[in-house]
Amino acid sequence: MAALRAVLLAAGMLALAAGPARAQRTARTEDFLGVTRCDSGQAVTEIREDVRRSDLQAEIEAHEAVHRQQAAAYGGCEAFLASLTTARRIIESELPAYCAQWKVAVARGADSSATRLDYAWRISAQSGAMENRLDIARRFRDECD
């Protein structure tokens, strides 16, 4: 028993010496199929080259178009992006964008329920609110038809 405690203590000390654990690296632009960013006060969308040559292009364009509209309605691109600081705000901005994307995907033949659930999980992950994924799935079902 003493040997086990010594091993656990040594492992704990090693973990502390290694520094804080990181679950994942910081997201980069190339991690996303499309990104809307600000350029001289205007919302500008960039879609990855591999997506522009695929069937996903229309879905991603629909999604990012919502973000451009949100930025314009918010009173400016920088102000809109600066407002995305909480899980609630991220969910509020992503839900209509994924809804637009879902409509295009379903029109192309994607399974409605499975795609809706997949997008709800993505919103949950992006917002850092995985514990709310069932609520987000319900909202997606109720608000996106």
Residue ranges and their predicted role:
Residues 55, 71-101:
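Post-HEXXH active-site segment of zinc metalloproteases
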Residues 19-23:
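Sec/Tat signal peptide C-region and signal peptidase I cleavage site
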Residues 6-17:
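Bacterial N-terminal signal peptides
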Residues 90, 102-145:
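Long, well-structured alpha-helical subdomains associated
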Residues 59-72:
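Active-site recognition of the HExxH zinc-binding catalytic motif
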Residues 24-32:
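Cleaved targeting-peptide boundary
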Residues 45-60:
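Short pre-active-site segment immediately N-terminal to the catalytic Zn-binding motif
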